[in-house]
Amino acid sequence: MSEYTPDLWVIVEIDSPEHGKIRKVLGSWYGGFGGSDEWRMNSGIEKVIDQGDYYDVVGYSGSIYKCYKNRVGWSAYTNRVYNNLKKELEDINMGTMEIVSI
């Protein structure tokens, strides 16, 4: 089981004709000086555990995303990633994607 703590995060909901609706964490990490920003999307949300200052978001794969409540959002980089993924889904008629609340 892997654990991730993104610098910023949002919840996306993907609605596809084949699989229906699924919610996922889209997390991002700042690369720092000389590094590259990174993003990761989990396998799908199985359950959310409110831990006070943060949520433990458990994915279908068993991974846990530790999502701090004061870090909801995204960088310009992650915004581009989201828009590209959303456009690709729509261009090939595989579904839609939108930002939703936890």
Q: What spans do the regions from the language model cover?
A:
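Cysteine-centric segments in proteins
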Residues: 1-56, 60-102
